[in-house]
Amino acid sequence: MLIGLFTELNGTGGVQRASRHLAAVLSEFAASRHLDYRLLSLNDTRELHRMSVGGKEFVFTGCERSKARFTATAIRAARRHGKVVLAGHPNLGPVAQAMRIAAPRLRTIICTHGVEVWEPLPAVRRLALGQANVVLAPSQDTANHVAEQHVRRERIRVLPWALDPEFEAIPANAPQGKLPHGYPEGRVILTVGRWLASERYKGMDTLITALPRLLTRWPELQLLAVGDGDDRAWLEELAEKNGVNRHVHFLTGVSFDELAACYQACEMFALPSRGEGFGLVYLEAMARGKPVIGGAHGGAPEVIEDGVTGYLVPHGDAAQLATSIETLLSDQAMAQKMGGRGRQRVEREFRFSVFAKSLKKILREQCES
């Protein structure tokens, strides 16, 4: 039996999207080897869920935030001829470790994402990482941080996340889709994320403080932030203090088709974050042929080629961010070329099939060990 442990599979964040990809590949691999599989989600509602990624359907059980139920179910699954457990987040590493105590032959794979391993982990999580057979990291930068948690280098594997198959299915020359209500008129800088006070490292505030300089030359410029969170009021207040509140817009409850249309319609995508372990939203924008601006930190430089598919800027440097945006706004032909190169890179390196092939190889190695 193959077992997958996840914090949440129904959510909208990057961790949830990556988790769905992991779950889809694990279930498909199990079927190809005529093995049973069991997928558990800690935070999803207590029922049997059905989900599909890239046309591949899988089922999982939600545990409605009950750590006791989640752990007990995982240990029972391990005792039923468990071969490999894949924990989709370091927070679940201790559960995988408990499963291994109950079923000593069980092989363990733990996935990391980025910022959660940038600081020393609690001892129990660090121990679980150190004793895992494989620790996955979406970028070399994240892998380096994992190694600082006293994980042996030979156990760390870099597995870049993939573009969601829904985005892959959109042709490069697809007509402009229907935009959501509230999409602003003018030249639009798009950013996508969860705007939380605990995640100000995303750099949304820097985008706002860069706007006054840009608006002196392009008064039609608009900043559109797709997503919501507890920091929205603070960001709106910051926009008002900078005199740009009429040029900063938030959209929530956006469907997939509407989000794809936003990527298609915008001039560029910007998320000058210092805390991206990888950055799935960069892939989404690149797949729609848009130049991308990201932070010169974390895993973003492994996705964005500076001066080729977009620009990398130091976190919090509003002047450098404004300069990069000015360059793209001033030369639309160059911006389109950058976007085209980004699309080509996604098609070459970050397709879901590439991710699936790499993960299946790791699963096969662990099953045969």
Ranges and model annotations:
Residues 129, 253-254, 261-266:
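Short alpha-helical donor nucleotide-sugar binding micro-motif in glycosyltransferases
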Residues 141, 162:
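Carbohydrate-associated surface elements
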Residues 274:
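Aromatic "clamp/platform" in nucleotide-sugar-dependent glycosyltransferases that forms part
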Residues 306-307, 311-318, 327-333:
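Conserved acidic donor-binding segment of nucleotide-sugar-dependent glycosyltransferases
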